[in-house]
């Protein structure tokens, strides 16, 4: 008996496509004219767009992006220029010639010191919130952003829907830099560089971080008072 011819291999059947979920198929309706005006108001009041009670729609207003971030970066650069070179040129012109370099060094040194403190602890102590409800929460914000953990290009909606959190943190850093640098005018020609750095290290934790949190922090005791 003649051997049978081998049957051709069957093609593998394609795997069935996953069933679409209702949430994936759902599409928010386009915004009406009234809802677009509502979104514009949310933009100026820094609240979430596209939501009004139980109604939701596809907002036409962009979230954090290049335009908003670019404007804030320009603002941050201008604030930094107030310190470097603004303050050291101003204070340098008020002291004797032999102390000009001392004032310049103090301003530059403070900028570096505060930048490191802000990255490591400062931003979290001012704008964090996981200390809320505790005694420590009346003084500092929280520890969730230590070393900029979780500080990404996504907005921190406790403070701004339209800005990346890392850009917001950089902008706030500029104020943390210029504030202790203003004190240099009171101690010019009176303190050594090392003494200034040690004094400002303590001053940031004892004065600036608690006060900034109380006024600007989402859980600050004086937030919204003015």
Outline where the language-model segments fall.
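Hydrophobic alpha-helical transmembrane bundles of multi-pass membrane proteins
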Residues: 2-226
């Amino acid at each position: 008996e003649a051997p049978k011819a081998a049957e051709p291999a069957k093609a593998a059947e394609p795997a069935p496509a996953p069933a679409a979920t209702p949430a994936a198929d759902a599409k928010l309706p386009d915004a009406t004219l009234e809802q677009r005006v509502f979104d514009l108001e949310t933009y100026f009041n820094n609240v979430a767009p596209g939501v009004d009670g139980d109604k939701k729609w596809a907002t036409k207003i962009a979230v954090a992006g290049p335009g908003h971030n670019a404007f804030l970066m320009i603002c941050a650069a201008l604030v930094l220029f107030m310190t470097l070179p603004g303050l050291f040129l101003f204070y340098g012109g008020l002291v004797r010639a032999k102390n000009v370099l001392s004032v310049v060094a103090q301003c530059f040194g403070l900028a570096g010191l505060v930048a490191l403190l802000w990255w490591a602890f400062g931003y979290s102590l001012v704008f964090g919130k996981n200390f809320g409800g505790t005694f420590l929460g009346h003084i500092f914000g929280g520890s969730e952003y230590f070393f900029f953990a979780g500080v990404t290009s996504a907005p921190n909606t406790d403070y701004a829907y339209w800005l990346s959190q890392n850009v917001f943190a950089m902008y706030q850093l500029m104020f943390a830099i210029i504030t202790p640098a203003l004190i240099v005018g009171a101690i010019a020609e009176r303190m050594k560089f090392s003494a200034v750095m040690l004094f400002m290290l303590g001053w940031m934790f004892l004065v600036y971080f608690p006060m900034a949190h109380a006024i600007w922090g989402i859980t600050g005791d004086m937030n919204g008072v003015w």
